[in-house]
A protein has these predicted regions:
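Helix-turn-helix
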Residues: 1-25, 29, 33
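Secondary-structure edge/capping motif, primarily at the C-terminal ends of alpha-helices
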Residues: 45-52, 91, 95-98, 141-148
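Amphipathic alpha-helical packing segments from all-alpha helical-bundle domains
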Residues: 78-79, 92-118, 127-128
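Hydrophobic alpha-helical segments that form the core
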Residues: 82-89, 123-144, 156-167
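Short alpha-helix boundary/capping elements
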Residues: 12, 24, 88-93, 137-142, ...
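Long amphipathic alpha-helical segments
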Residues: 147, 170-183
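Generic hydrophobic, amphipathic alpha-helix propensity
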Residues: 30-42
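Hydrophobic alpha-helical connector segments
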Residues: 43-80
Length: 183
């Protein structure tokens, strides 16, 4: 909070604390600003997928990536992407706010639609393949957001990220991994 008041050239940290209560309240507010837009965009993409009939992996990967990738070119979007990358990379440390990123209604829907494409061993514990894909997307977009001034065209990056998400979701578990799961 001190950093924010310093950046805003303010001396009264009490006003900020009064408005947001604490750091968690501030993070919730920041996450909700873009999170609702991302959730709505993803929801529309999922509606299209369900309307088109039997879902396939690539459109589902697009539904995960595209709403977030759109933020690379929008106002404070890059800062949001960097923040969510940090939160998702350390979910235990940020347990009070990470759910504002990972438990959005559209992500719950996406998780159900993508489950049939996952190898059986990758559903739920201990591998959590869907969360791995979500964390990977946030990490990659957060890294890209840091370089936004040097790379203004994000189309190739976004398409490649979608390809990688398809691979993350559908890659079979190796014999070694399967054996370790059974131990």
């Amino acid at each position: 909070m001190r950093e924010i008041t310093r950046a805003a050239d303010q001396r009264n940290t009490n006003a900020l604390q009064y408005h947001f209560s604490d750091r968690t309240g501030l993070l919730r507010d920041l996450l909700n600003r873009h999170g609702e837009t991302v959730d709505q965009h993803r929801g529309l993409l999922l509606n299209e997928i369900e309307t088109d009939g039997e879902p396939t992996v690539r459109p589902l990967a697009q539904a995960l990536v595209l709403p977030l990738a759109a933020l690379l070119s929008e106002g404070r979007g890059p800062e949001y992407l960097q923040l969510t990358a940090e939160l998702v990379a350390r979910p235990v440390h940020f347990s009070q706010v990470v759910d504002f990123v990972t438990l959005r209604p559209s992500l719950a829907r996406w998780s159900m639609l993508v489950e049939p494409f996952l190898p059986a061993e990758a559903v739920g514990r201990p591998l959590h393949r869907r969360f791995t894909a979500i964390r990977f997307v946030h990490n990659e977009l957060g890294s890209r957001a840091k370089e936004r001034h040097s790379r203004p065209d994000h189309r190739l990056f976004t398409s490649h990220l979608i390809d990688l998400v398809c691979g993350v979701l559908t890659a079979p578990a190796s014999a070694e991994t399967s054996a370790l799961i059974e131990k």
